[in-house]
Amino acid sequence: MDIPFKTKRILRFGDCDISGTAYFPAYLDILNNVNEEFWQALGYAWHETIPNAGWGTPTVHLSCDFSTPSVFGDVLDFELRVLKVGRSSLTVRHYITCQGEARWDSTQVLVASDLNKHCAIPWPDEVRKALMACIPNPNNDH
């Protein structure tokens, strides 16, 4: 997997309001899909870890800053950077651009969670190792 993780999304008709501008709740759905793609690229596809390993990664914090509107048909470039890996938390930063122009960005904190007990758990060792490998300089405090 390339570091930082990058992917593209076309802004579809259903992602927009009546004016053809991106509807912000659709952005959150797209962001969730980007997260799912990141985990799959990392080797921990949600469709396998959720039913088989019994843990998931719910979002416990999300902040977004919107700088420029996007419109139907725009190709959005998503960049996901792992900033910090805690005992059970993961802080990521999303940068979303279109043709090099910033559109919005987001900081998100996800937590490893036991899906039966609904509580935070430490990252499994192999998952922690994979996440730490996503930090360009793990000794650098972000």
Q: Where do the language-model regions lie?
A:
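Terminal targeting signals and extreme-terminal segments of soluble enzymes
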Residues: 1-77, 83-142
